[in-house]
């Protein structure tokens, strides 16, 4: 019981710190909650807009140089990463870190469930009422009322019994 109380207190403290540090670059609706290790990285030109009743599970990261918009009633599994920018890499004679960034907004509609370890890349738009399965890398436009999942098959090979010879 004591741990639940402390966990709720820590969540409130994290929300207060977010609002104090980035109040001009972040907008958070009512009913917002998050667990431990959630990081919002917002550069001077960045902005994050979060609707009402949004929940972030442990260790999610949002990184903004442009704009990330999240609708109402969204839930995020553990380890979700959202980026509105990527490194430029046009000139082989210039180090990548000196070439700046390509920035495209990210938009997540209302009532979306983003599964654990999803990566959302610059320019992605996820329509309302969509579910993104665990481990998916999202880019481009996902229509509303969609379910997106990885189609990966496990390859299971048999280990043969017998003797082993190193030569």
Predicted features along the sequence, with ranges:
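Extended, small-residue-rich solenoid/repeat segments and analogous flexible loops
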Residues: 1-39
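Flexible, glycine/small-residue-enriched loop-and-beta-strand segment within the central core
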Residues: 17, 35-50, 55-124, 151-153, ...
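Sparse recognition of residues in long alpha-helices and their boundaries
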Residues: 70, 128, 145-146
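Short-chain dehydrogenase/reductase
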Residues: 75, 113, 131, 137, ...
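Beta-rich strand-turn-strand
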Residues: 116-131, 136-140
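Acidic, glycine-centered active-site loop in nucleotide-sugar glycosyltransferases
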Residues: 143-144, 150-152
């Amino acid at each position: 019981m004591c741990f639940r109380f402390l966990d709720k207190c820590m969540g409130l403290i994290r929300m207060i710190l977010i609002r104090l540090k980035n109040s001009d670059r972040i907008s958070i609706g009512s009913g917002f909650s998050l667990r431990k290790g959630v990081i919002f990285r917002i550069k001077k030109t960045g902005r994050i807009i979060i609707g009402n009743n949004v929940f972030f599970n442990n260790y999610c990261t949002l990184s903004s140089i442009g704009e990330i918009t999240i609708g109402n009633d969204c839930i995020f599994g553990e380890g979700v990463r959202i980026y509105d920018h990527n490194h430029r890499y046009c000139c082989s004679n210039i180090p990548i870190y000196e070439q700046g960034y390509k920035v495209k907004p990210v938009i997540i509609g209302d009532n979306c469930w983003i599964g654990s370890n999803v990566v959302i890349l610059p320019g992605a738009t996820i329509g309302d009422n969509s579910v993104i399965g665990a481990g998916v890398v999202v880019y481009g436009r996902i229509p509303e009322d969609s379910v997106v999942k990885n189609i990966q098959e496990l390859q299971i090979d048999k280990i043969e019994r017998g003797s082993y010879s190193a030569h």
